[in-house]
C-alpha cells in the first residue's frame, strides 16, 4: 500500500495555538511529537506500506520538509490552492499511478490519535484485502462509544460480512446528525463513525471517479501529463471546483465497503477532545505548561509561555500564546471557528 497523509488543513478549532503557518498537524497536541510525525511513524512501522506521501499546501510544504522525518522531499505533494479533499486525493492518486497503475493507496488524516498500533495495522490489512478482492472503495469505520453529533456516520449491511475480514457493504452515508438521531444511530448497531480513512486500488478510484465525478476526472486527466513531467499545473488546477470526497464520491458510489475498526481512535477535533485524552490532576484538571487551578474542576490550561492561574471556575479552557489568549467554556469550543471567521473578516491577519 502507498500511504497518503492529508496535511493541508488549518486546524481553526485549535486557535490560538493553531495558525496558518503552524496548524494543528504541526503541533505537539499529545505526546512529544507533532501529530503529523506521529502519523508518519505509525505507517513506517507497518510492513505492507511501500511508501509514504504527504499532501499539503505550498505554504506548509517547506516547513513539513524540514520538520518531518521519514518522508522523501519528492513525496511531498503540493496543492497550488486548497480545493477540499476530492481534488487533493485525486492529485495524490495521479502521483501513485505514475509509479504503479495497479497500486493500492490508503488515505489518512494527519492529525488523528490512534491507540493500538497492531489493531490499526490489522484493520488496514483487511481494507487492503477487500479493495483487491472486490475492486471496491473501502473506508474504515469507527465503532461509536457515544451518540456524537460531531461526526458523520456510515450505515452498513450486517448481512454482508466478508468472511473473517470484518468488512461490510455500505448502505448509506449520513451527515452529522442532531442528538436524537445520533442516539438512534448508535442504538441500532449498524452505524459507524466516519473517520475519513480510505483504501482502494488506484484503478478502482479512477473508475468510480469517471462515473460519479466526471468533471474532476476530466480535469485530472489534463493535469496528469504535467504532474508526471514535474511541470507547473496551477492554471489548470484553478479551474477545479472544490468538493469533498465524501459528498462527491463516497455518497454516490454503490461499490463501497467499510471495515470496522479494532483500535481506539479520537480525531482530536477540539480543545475539549484534548481534555478528554490528557492526564488529569486529582481535581480532574489538565495543565499543559505553566499553570495552577484553585477551587476548580474539569479545566484545561494550555500555557507554555507564561504562568496561568484559574480560580473558582469549572469546565473552562484557557489557551495562552505569545500574542493571544483564549478563555472559553468547554461546551462552547466548537464556536472557536466563528471567532476565527470574525478575525478574517476584520483583517486581523497577524492573529491567523
Sequence positions of predicted segments:
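Conserved core of the sugar-phosphate nucleotidyltransferase
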Residues: 117-236, 257, 330
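Short histidine/acidic/glycine/proline-rich micro-motifs that form metal-
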Residues: 112-114, 144, 265
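A residue-level structural signature of the nucleotidyltransferase/glycosyltransferase Rossmann-like core
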Residues: 53, 105, 171, 190, ...
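Conserved N-terminal catalytic core of the sugar/cofactor nucleotidyltransferase
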Residues: 2-5, 13-16, 20, 31-109, ...
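Short beta-strand segments
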Residues: 6-7, 55, 106-109, 139-143, ...
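Residue-level signal for inorganic ion chemistry
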Residues: 36, 92, 111, 154, ...
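Left-handed beta-helix
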Residues: 202-352
Amino acid at each position: 500500500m502507498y500511504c497518503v497523509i492529508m496535511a493541508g488543513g488549518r486546524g481553526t478549532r485549535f486557535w490560538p495555538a493553531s495558525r496558518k503557518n503552524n496548524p494543528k498537524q504541526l503541533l505537539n497536541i499529545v505526546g512529544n511529537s507533532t501529530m503529523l510525525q506521529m502519523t508518519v511513524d505509525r505507517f513506517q512501522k507497518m510492513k505492507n506500506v511501500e511508501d509514504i506521501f504527504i499532501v499539503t499546501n505550498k505554504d506548509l510544504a517547506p516547513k513539513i520538509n524540514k520538520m518531518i522525518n521519514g518522508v522523501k522531499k519528492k513525496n511531498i505533494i503540493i496543492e497550488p490552492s486548497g480545493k477540499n479533499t476530492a481534488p487533493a486525493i485525486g492529485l495524490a492518486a495521479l502521483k501513485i499511478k505514475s509509479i504503479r497503475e495497479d497500486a493500492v493507496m490508503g488515505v489518512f488524516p494527519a492529525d488523528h490519535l490512534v491507540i493500538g498500533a497492531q489493531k490499526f495495522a490489522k484493520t488496514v490489512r483487511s481494507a487492503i484485502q477487500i479493495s483487491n478482492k472486490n475492486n471496491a472503495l473501502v473506508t474504515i469505520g469507527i465503532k461509536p462509544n457515544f451518540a456524537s453529533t460531531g461526526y458523520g456516520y456510515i450505515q452498513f449491511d450486517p448481512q454482508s460480512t466478508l468472511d473473517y475480514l470484518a468488512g461490510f457493504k455500505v448502505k448509506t452515508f449520513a451527515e452529522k446528525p442532531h442528538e436524537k438521531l445520533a442516539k438512534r444511530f448508535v442504538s441500532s448497531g449498524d452505524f459507524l463513525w466516519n473517520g475519513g480513512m480510505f483504501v482502494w486500488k488506484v484503478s478502482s478510484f479512477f473508475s468510480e471517479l469517471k462515473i460519479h465525478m466526471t468533471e474532476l476526472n476530466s480535469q485530472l486527466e489534463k493535469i496528469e501529463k504535467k504532474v508526471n513531467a514535474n511541470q507547473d499545473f496551477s492554471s489548470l488546477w484553478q479551474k477545479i471546483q472544490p468538493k469533498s470526497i465524501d459528498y462527491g464520491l463516497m455518497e454516490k458510489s454503490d461499490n463501497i465497503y467499510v471495515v470496522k475498526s479494532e483500535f481506539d481512535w479520537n480525531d482530536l477535533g477540539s480543545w475539549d477532545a484534548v481534555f478528554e485524552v490528557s492526564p488529569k490532576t486529582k481535581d480532574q484538571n489538565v495543565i499543559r505548561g505553566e499553570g495552577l487551578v484553585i477551587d476548580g474542576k474539569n479545566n484545561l490550561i494550555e500555557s507554555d509561555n507564561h504562568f496561568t492561574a484559574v480560580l473558582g471556575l469549572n469546565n473552562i479552557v484557557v489557551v495562552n500564546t505569545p500574542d493571544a489568549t483564549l478563555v472559553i467554556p468547554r461546551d462552547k469550543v466548537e464556536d472557536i471557528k466563528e471567532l476565527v471567521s470574525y478575525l478574517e473578516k476584520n483583517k486581523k491577519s497577524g492573529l491567523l
